[in-house]
Amino acid sequence: MSFVTTIKQQFEANENVAYGKKQSDYLKNNFPFYGIPTTKRREILKDALLLHKEEVSTNFRAICWELFQLPQREMHHAAIDIFLKEIKNKYQIEDIVLIEKLLLTNSWWDSVDTLAKYALGGYLKAFPEKTLEIIEKFSNADSMWLNRTAIIFQLGYKERTDFELLRSECEKHKHSTEFFIQKAIGWALREYGSVNPTAVLHYVNSTNLKPLSKKEAIRKII
């Protein structure tokens, strides 16, 4: 039995239709859910990984992509958990292809934000020389989710944040009417404001951000 088959069987065995409906409602009914709480889902995943340790270690990229193409949202979250666990210190230059595919498949804030911060953020720490090329591509893409990713990928960078790049992304997208873009700008600025509040305040006060972006950017500074 393959890893994916094991996960399917265990998720189906733990399905809770009523809770799944609530989870689906929370994400605007974009995805069906088995109705498995996060803690239980991760317990199931942990047990399955122990049973299929060698298969997953060898083929985790293909497994993640297979899971991400299934309809249930728990499958997508399992794929992300596996990818982030297995990819540590194993990034390859071509992994950007898979990361972009995951960002563009079954996209919503809950998957995109995790992939942006940890998958792309980790990849660009491993290959910093690719940063400008990839962020320019994502920033100019027709996909709002890739645009959001270009803005928030530095969320975990703290003092290592390239503030010039962040400002550039904010300037490029500050007139967007997309809720998720306005929130992304505010979130990214707020996170950097935790280590450099003076720079963030100066930027916010000297540029014409949308009200939501400005509110989100300064709400922990002022």
Spell out what each predicted region is.
Residues M1-I222:
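Alpha-helical scaffold domains
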